[in-house]
């Protein structure tokens, strides 16, 4: 098979590279930002579908769920299964992506809710510790014979190779797509205080996602904002909201503040255009749909 150049070393680009390598392609990943410098490294990364087109998101998310569930058997992957609850301010809140969950994973009605919430859906989903997982993905690329190289591009590569454009927000320039906009997300990492249940507010960017050594508290979703500098006032609000959801977080030691720019678009772009396969615009849903999207990229490459 021919050579493929994947542009972008976030979770989508690396996952596409792994699937292409597994399918027998020769793959080189090039990116301005290496994996731990990408927005993907900031993600709390609890499997939780959203974005459009919904019918594809459900399919992509289910494929990713199944792959992540299998990766839980690998202690080096950074993937674990955790039970958590999506919270609603109104009675009878529901999710449109129920069918993306496998049998037995939920969602089930939750009766023990934080103050201010009228209903909740509890389910068992993958939670991905991104600094560990991005290292695992990079290692898998190299193990399969691929490479990951820092390269600052002003345009997509031209030549005989097939190109996969997984450049995220970089697709404004590289893909000539002004519909891709940044959605600023700020998080606070605090010490792990014995929490193993995740919480997501369905109506706001507030969430509490426990990991092995810390807890990720979010967040914000400010469209069109490019600043990567943490805002102390926003951090205080994040901490206050998190403590309302999970009181054990009150006074937890702060470890780090982080900001990422989600690459949002009215709908994910996953299509082939000549010798370029575009796969970007996932917003904050990149981890959740990553393996399903990568499967479609391979199908387009082989088709």
Name each model-derived stretch.
Residues 3-28:
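N-terminal Rossmann-like FAD-binding beta1-loop-alpha1 element of flavoenzymes
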Residues 22-40:
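Glycine-rich FAD pyrophosphate-binding loop
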Residues 44-49, 82-88, 171-200, 239-249, ...:
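Central beta-strand plus flanking loop segment that forms part of the substrate or channel wall
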Residues 55-63, 120-136, 229-234, 289:
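Short beta-strand to alpha-helix junction loop
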Residues 66-144, 265:
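Flavin (FAD/FMN) cofactor-binding and adjacent substrate-gating region
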Residues 82-83, 87-93, 239-302:
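Flavin (FAD/FMN) cofactor-binding core of flavoprotein oxidoreductases
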Residues 146-159:
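A conserved short coil-to-beta-strand element within the FAD-binding core of flavoproteins
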Residues 195, 212-214, 222-261:
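Flavin-binding catalytic cores
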